[in-house]
Amino acid sequence: MDEFPTEYFLGTAVRLLENVKYRDSNYTREERIENLSYANNKAAAHFAQERQQRILKVNPKRLEASLRTIVGMVVYSWVKVSKELMADLSIHYTYTLILDDSEDDPHNNMLTFFDDLQAGREQKHPWWMLVNEHFPNVLRHFGPFCSLNLIRSTLDFFEGCWIEQYNFHGFPGSYDFPGFLRRMNGLGHCVGGSLWPKELFDEQKHFLEITSAVAQMENWMVWVNDLMSFYKEFDDPRDQTSLVKNYVVCDEISLTQALEKLTVDTLTSSEQMMEVFSDKDAKLMETIECFMHGYITWHLCDHRYRLKEVYEGTMHIETEDAIKFRKFYGQAAKVGAIEHEEWAFPTVAERIEVRLAEEKAAKDGQAVLTSAEPAVPQAAQEVLA
């Protein structure tokens, strides 16, 4: 398969959108911009701090791009939670995206991971240093069960990224490997657990429903992500260990067959999600449905996924799927296509510049005060001594 399978992708996307009854009415435009601005301001201020910059060593422009992507994901999808939780989750998931894009081998920094954890010492790995410092800000919003899901899933994610450092597709015949790796680095339990803040849900009262939601969300959100990422990953050398390409190697099938496998699984998961929770507590179902619709809007509108290119490429195609896709994309763009200039400011780089200028001014001011202090005569020094 040398050319991107446009028609097949359009059909798959349309079936997904129809299955979840896509109709994102989560916000007014003003509400969306307000939440984006709030989450971005707090998260950008966090990453512009001296400690974060010194330890992460990530280019501010690259960090800014990661932050914009994650703030969009959180605000569009975690519709029912407070703005404060949106901001705290934006910081946490930006850390995960930074790790996902990293190429550093964690081996040496992980040699004493458990010993340091048990002794309450700071971790050696710089990512864990900062994630652990911020984690209490996230976990304060949740009960113990949901918190455990967030902690465990974040740990799994780190291990999954570690495995991906080797660009390993799995061995031919290792049918369990693609799903194993994707569940590990998909953050499904972290996402599934973070939909239920204690200010909105009693996790003891809704324990069974929350457990089921975490189980269903584990696959749904990663498969939708893989499906919506297929276009951008198709010919990107940095994305060669995707789930679809791992299926090709491990299952020894063609790329078309691997995409079909992902498609069937995604559609089945969507049907199960809608069916399982349709007769449950209305507040639970509303949270799940709003997440699903917002998560899809984010994929369709975020520049990272380049789906606008697919939309524009269908203008000359008059098949039923192409027409439906353009209609769905138009619906998503109407509510979700908001340029970063409307909410992502000041940027991380601008905040760093201001911080450095303030630090320099304070240092210069201190130097002036020090030089202006009168010298203590020698005789007085002897008396004081």
Swiss-Prot record:
Any GO molecular function: trichodiene synthase activity
Source superkingdom: Eukaryota
One biological process term in Gene Ontology: sesquiterpenoid biosynthetic process
Its EC number(s): 4.2.3.6
Catalysed transformations (reactions): (2E,6E)-farnesyl diphosphate = trichodiene + diphosphate
Its biological purpose: TS is a member of the terpene cyclase group of enzymes. It catalyzes the isomerization and cyclization of farnesyl pyro-phosphate to form trichodiene, the first cyclic intermediate in the biosynthetic pathway for trichothecenes. It serves to branch trichothecene biosynthesis from the isoprenoid pathway.
Miscellaneous: Trichothecenes are sesquiterpenoid toxins that act by inhibiting protein biosynthesis.
Family listed: Belongs to the trichodiene synthase family.
Protein name, UniProt field: Trichodiene synthase
Organism: Paramyrothecium roridum
Organism taxonomic ancestry: Eukaryota, Fungi, Dikarya, Ascomycota, Pezizomycotina
Recorded name of the encoding gene: TRI5
